[in-house]
Amino acid sequence: MSGPLDRFTSPCFSNNGEKREKKSDFEVSEDEKKTRIGGILKKKSSKSKFRHSLKRRGSRSIDRTLSLTFEDIHDAEELRYVSEFRQSLISDHLLPPNLDDYHIMLRFLFARKFDLGKAKLMWTNMIQWRRDFGTDTILEDFEFPELDEVLRYYPQGYHGVDKEGRPVYIERLGKVDASKLMQVTTLERYLRYHVKEFEKTITVKFPACCIAAKRHIDSSTTILDVQGLGLKNFTKTARDLIIQLQKIDSDNYPETLHRMFIINAGSGFKLLWGTVKSFLDPKTVSKIHVLGNKYQNKLLEMIDASQLPDFFGGTCTCADQGGCMRSDKGPWKDSEILKMGRSGGTFCRHAGAFLSSDSQISSSDKPTYSLKVSDTSTAKSGSELEEMASPKTNTNNHVPKLTPVSEYANGNISPTVLSEYEECVPMVDKVVDVAWQLQEMPNASEGPQYTSSLGKIGSVRHIWSWLTAFFISFFTLLASLALPQTKEHSQLHSSSVRAELCDERIARESRPPSPPRSTITERVIISSVLSRLGDLEKQIENLHSRKSEMPHEKEELLNAAVYRVDALEAELITTKKALHEALIRQEELLGYIDRQKEAKCRRKKFCW
């Protein structure tokens, strides 16, 4: 279901030498007076190549593109965690330039509750996956000509932004036909298409939303329409597809979901959701809103009507682009915004940056089209606009590159300051509390308590796992009830599941509140649920795969029994006929006897 917007900003380091202060863009009270710390780029040794010049050399042409400046305020504790995590990655050569970004590393730390060891393992697996999958070049290498057919059988895509500027992703699960989807493409090709769209979202959509909203955007709002969702939608193919998509998203693009709406949910859906959400973290549950068929007002609270498709209660139809699901509407379709991004027309002022090896704070070294956000923003003056021309190395690329790690990791940076670049180097505008440097670094074991104090980004990496288990359990139960051969088994299994859930719920309610479940416990539960569902699915498949034709021996026995029944029926008919004739004969005899008695009585009277 991601993309930090300052992924192309490389940090630079300041020594114990010169520092420069800039005036604040906002006033602070005496009680809130903070220390302003700034850093400037150090000039490299003459033996090293300074490849990422901040001034355009050679040509004296001036880029008149409007330059916008925004601040990105970093939390002090988060900054310390990210700095330590970053240094650990650099020491093990695990930080490629395109991933050397504050927000990317922060998302991985959030995904592992600020456990540096687990976050590093997750990061290592992600790096290896990108190499094996070819993710870094997938935008250029992979083509997907069957997209129109795929969207017919799996309607999904981005459409517009919410009121906070985040892109809105829509899936109409009730119209998914996995069998036909696999006829027009393959599972492997669809997974590659999914990764390509995710990379496009990170490198194009999120930066465009950031420019349009003038704030940092690296997450999305999702709408899942479950109207018409039935057993036909959740075949084994659909299950394999969902599980693999979920694994890719949660392992390699963590913490990218801001909010999810599940609309047109029926009563059965809501009942099962009430059970499933008891296993989820409260922060995760707070991001998921399960709505019935009266969802329009809730959606319109979060998304403007002009950005919402008409079939969801909005006013947008995208009639000239083949409908809303095919239009890919959003700021990323605005040529001016794309031009501004590609030309480096937006400038990021970092309020707080990485800690160098000597524990000094340093700032960003160059402009980048990705925006870091705070509540304040300023526009560059005319002279600054001339100074802010994008570097030569980036003029031919849609995506500017970072300064290589080797240029700041080898420790060969000269302490001499480049005076000619002083005006181009952004200063740190963060208002920093002096006392925070004296605080102890929280231990890894204190990660959960620390994350609970942050309260900004909830863990959502298991949402798709739980939803997958939820959907499959619901429809597997329906399938079991629909088969007479497995009715008794389904009832017993359903009873046992309800009993287990009831016992667990009672036990949970009876014990005192405990900390949130650990990641390992959640993984064990998910694995157990999916394993049991897999066993049930195999049993159902075995029942479906049994031959409908009866074995020859049993067929002969059945035919013999049928013939015997036919013979018995014939004998019964003959017996009935004989009995009927006997009854007629009996009636005749009784009539004859009665006539003889009457004749005898008449003779006696005549004699008298």
UniProtKB/Swiss-Prot annotation:
GO cellular component, one term: plasma membrane
Domain CRAL-TRIO: 146-320
Keyword Lyase applies: no
Membrane topology (UniProt): Peripheral membrane protein
Basic and acidic residues bias spans: 17-33
One Pfam family per UniProt: CRAL_TRIO
Main location as per UniProt: Golgi
Family: Belongs to the SFH family.
Protein name, entry field: Phosphatidylinositol/phosphatidylcholine transfer protein SFH4
Source organism per UniProt: Arabidopsis thaliana (Mouse-ear cress)
This protein's encoding gene: SFH4
